[in-house]
Amino acid sequence: GMAEAAESVLLVTDHVVGARSISDLGAEVDDDVLDQLWSQLQRAHAAGLAHGSIDASSVVVDESGRLWLLDWASGETISTELSRRVDLAQALALTALAVGAERAIDAASRSLTTAQLASIAPMLQRVVLPRQTREVMGRRGASRQVLQDLRDALVALTPTADAEPA
């Protein structure tokens, strides 16, 4: 739950038993788990929240297959459109590393509007991604290619998208 006192906000969560990072699960991640990520992110954004640092340590799956979006310390309680777009780009890049660009785009397409998808393309650049995600991309030697593949797929899906970095 979340509570406010004066100018402070307190967020209390459950301990997640058997949590495994979405990145560690890789191909084991099913479409339901991907859909849970996008659904949780949309609910947070609708409530005015932005996460700010979506990486492998903040997206975990418990023993029952339930996805948890953790580590909201870098988040915003009165988020801007830009910070919400950053969240979307971070989530898309993270899921692409875990399950591949095609499945990541398919999952995002099931939950996001065409306008939201189009807004992600220019945000897909290394500087927008959390350090941990950039490091994983670098270790795989895939940094620029993964981001370019995602931008290309978004432009193909939403031809009005501007894929040039913002």
Identify the meaning behind each predicted range.
Residues S8-V9, G65:
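Conserved catalytic motifs of the protein kinase core domain
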Residues I120, R126-A166:
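Regulatory N- and C-terminal appendages and interdomain linkers associated
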Residues G1-S8:
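Short beta-strand micro-motifs within the conserved protein kinase catalytic domain, predominantly
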Residues A19-L25, T77-I78:
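Short small-residue beta-strand/loop micro-motif enriched in glycine and branched aliphatics
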Residues L11-A19:
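Short pocket-lining segment of the protein kinase catalytic domain that shapes the ATP-binding cleft
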Residues H51, D62-S64, W68-R134:
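C-lobe/activation-segment region of protein kinase-like
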Residues H15, V60-V61:
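Conserved hydrophobic "DFG−1" position in protein kinase catalytic cores
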Residues I22-S57, L67:
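Conserved kinase catalytic-core helix
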